Amino acid sequence: MPSALAFVLLVLNISLLKGQSPPGKPEIHKCRSPDKETFTCWWNPGTDGGLPTNYSLTYSKEGEKTTYECPDYKTSGPNSCFFSKQYTSIWKIYIITVNATNQMGSSSSDPLYVDVTYIVEPEPPRNLTLEVKQLKDKKTYLWVKWSPPTITDVKTGWFTMEYEIRLKPEEAEEWEIHFTGHQTQFKVFDLYPGQKYLVQTRCKPDHGYWSRWSQESSVEMPNDFTLKDTTVWIIVAILSAVICLIMVWAVALKGYSMMTCIFPPVPGPKIKGFDTHLLEKGKSEELLSALGCQDFPPTSDCEDLLVEFLEVDDNEDERLMPSHSKEYPGQGVKPTHLDPDSDSGHGSYDSHSLLSEKCEEPQAYPPTLHIPEITEKPENPEANIPPTVDPQSTNPNFHVDAPKSSTWPLLPGQHMPRSPYHSVADVCKLAGSPVNTLDSFLDKAEENVLKLSKALETGEEEVAEQKGAKSFPSDKQNTPWPLLQEKSPTVYVKPPDYVEIHKVNKDGVLSLFPKQRENNQTEKPGVPETSKEYAKVSGITDNNILVLVPDSRAQNTALLEESAKKAPPSFEADQSEKDLASFTATSSNRRLQLGRLDYLDPTCFMHSFH
C-alpha cells in the first residue's frame, strides 16, 4: 500500500511539472427560439488545462429524473446545441448544464432554467422599403415599409410582433428611433431636404427579445424648396424694404429721430387757436387778438357780497316833501317813471323771478353832519334847550341822498328812502347820550331829507313859502323854532316818539313799544299794554349791522297811531311835529309798502357808516 500511494503522487507531480490541469468551468451564454418550435443554446468554454477537452450539454425536464444529452451540436455552430421540433416542448421547463472533461479531470457550468415561450428572439424583418411621398399641400415625407420574419407565424396569431425603426443622416452618428407598435409601415415627417438617410428595422414578440437590426436601407430626400415658397419670400422682402423706406423718408421729412417716430411723446392738452409761443414770450395782447378777444375781461370786486340782488334806481321825484293835507301821507305823490330800457333795471322790475348780478361802483360818501354849539338861549327859559355837543364826539353819518338800493323789484310808487339808522352800535351810542342831543341829531337828519326833496321840485321857493306858512304860526314868535331856523340848519324840534326793543322771540321777531319822554327826561319804559311784533331780523352783517324787515303793514300803522296819541300837546312842537310826522308817515308808508320784501341790501347799510 505505501508503495502504490507513492507511485500516484509521483505521477501527479510529473503532470504538474508539465503544465497540465483539469478544464475550467464553462458558462451558458443564452438560449433562443425563433418560432417557439425550435431553440438553440450557446455557451462559452473555460480553460482546457493544457489537455484536449470534451464539452457536452445535458438537460432534463422539470418533473423528470431522466437526463438527456444535446441532440445536435452542428446545426447552430460550435459550442452550441440545437433542439429540433422533436425535442422541443413549449409547456416544459428545461434544466440545462454544460460539462467540460479532459485527462486531468472535468468541470460543469451552473444550471440554466429555460422556458421556450420566454426565450423567443425572432429574425429581423425583411423586405425593408423606403419611399418619398408628397401630401396635397406639397409637403414631403418618408414612407417606410417592411415584412415580418419568414419563419414567424404571424398570420395565425401564434405570434404578436412589435416593431421599431431607426434612421439618421448619412454623416450623422446618432440614430433617431421610432416605435411603430404592431404596424409594418411608418411615415417620417420633417426631414431635411437634400439629405441622404439610412434606415433599419427590428421586431420583438410579446414575451421575448428584440431581434437584430435589419440591413441598412438608404434614401435621399429631394430639395422641396419650390417656386411658391420663393415667391412668398420675395414678397416679404419687398414689403419689408418698402416699410423701411417709408420710415426713413418720414424721419427725414419731419426732422424727428427714429425713437420719436416709434415711441411718440404723449400729447398734452391744447386749446384750439391757442398759440403757446406767444404765451411763452409774454405777449398777452397778441395772444388775445389771436383768440378774438379785445382785452382781458373786467374783474369783479363783488366777491364779498352776501346776496346778489337786482339793481333798482330810486326815482328822484319820490323823495319830494309830502303834502300836509289831511289825506293819508304819500297819496298825493306821483312818481315819474324812468326809461324802462335804462341800465337801472326798471325794464325788468315787473319780473319776480329775474335777478341780475350786482356789482356796486364806489359811491361818494355823504357829508358828515356836525351839530354846532348853540350859545343863544331861547326867550322861554322853560323850553327845551339843546345841549352843547362835544365836537370831538363821534356823530353818526346820515346817508340821506343814496340814490340806489338793491332789493326785489317794486312798483314805482313803492320805493322808499332808506333810514339813516342802520348800525345797532351807533343807535346804542345815541340812546346813551342825552335826550336833547339825540333829538337834535334826528331832527337834523330829517330836515336834510326835506331840503333835498324840496330842491328837486320846480318852483322851489313857492313851495317853501307855502310849507313855511303852514308849519310856523305868526302868533308864536317867542318859541324856539324861529330862533333855531335863523341860527343853523340844525334846528331843535321835538321829534315824534320812538320805540324801544322789548324782546326778541325764537323766530327772530322784535317786540317794540313807544318810548315816553317828558320834561326832557327819559322815563323808564314800563310794560306796554299790548306789545306788537312788527319787525323781523333778516340777518346780521360782518359789522354787527342788524337788518330788519317789516312784518306787516297793519302793525306799523298801529304803532304810528300809538306814537301820535302819546305825543305831548305843546303848541311849540305841534307844527314841527306835523311836518316831521308827515315825513315820518310818508316814510312809514313806504316801509309798509315794502311788506312783501324778504330781505334788505346789507351793502347799502354799510356805505352809510363809512
Swiss-Prot record:
Residues engaged in binding Zn(2+) = D206, H207
Biased composition, Low complexity: where in the chain? Answer: 345-354
Where found, per UniProt?
Answer: Membrane
Q: Which residues form the Fibronectin type-III domain?
A: 22-122, 124-224
* Transmembrane annotation, as ranges: 230-253
- GO terms, molecular function: cytokine binding; lipid binding; metal ion binding; peptide hormone binding; prolactin receptor activity; protein kinase binding
**InterPro entries reported for this sequence:** FN3_dom, FN3_sf, Growth/epo_recpt_lig-bind, Ig-like_fold, Long_hematopoietin_rcpt_CS, Type-I_Cytokine_Rcpt
Show which residues sit on the Cytoplasmic side of the membrane: 254-610
Tell me which positions the record assigns to the signal sequence.
1-19
**Record region (Disordered):** 317-355, 458-482, 564-584
Query: Motif location (WSXWS motif)?
Result: 210-214
Which cystines does this chain contain? C31-C41, C70-C81
Topological category with respect to the lipid bilayer: Single-pass type I membrane protein
Task: Give any Gene Ontology cellular component.
Answer: external side of plasma membrane
CDD domains assigned: FN3 (cd00063)
The UniProt keywords, alphabetically, are: Disulfide bond, Glycoprotein, Membrane, Metal-binding, Receptor, Repeat, Signal, Transmembrane, Transmembrane helix, Zinc
Q: Which residues lie on this side of the membrane: Extracellular?
A: 20-229
Q: What residue intervals hold the motif Box 1 motif?
A: 262-270
The UniProt entry's GO biological process terms, in alphabetical order, are: cell surface receptor signaling pathway via JAK-STAT; cellular response to granulocyte macrophage colony-stimulating factor stimulus; cytokine-mediated signaling pathway; lactation; mammary gland alveolus development; mammary gland epithelial cell differentiation; mammary gland epithelium development; negative regulation of apoptotic process
Q: Which family does it belong to?
A: Belongs to the type I cytokine receptor family. Type 1 subfamily.
Q: What is known of its domains?
A: The WSXWS motif appears to be necessary for proper protein folding and thereby efficient intracellular transport and cell-surface receptor binding. The box 1 motif is required for JAK interaction and/or activation.
Task: Summarize the subunit comment.
Answer: Interacts with SMARCA1. Interacts with NEK3 and VAV2 and this interaction is prolactin-dependent.
Please give the function described in this protein's UniProt entry: This is a receptor for the anterior pituitary hormone prolactin.
Name of the protein described by the UniProt record: Prolactin receptor
Q: Which organism is it from?
A: Rattus norvegicus (Rat)
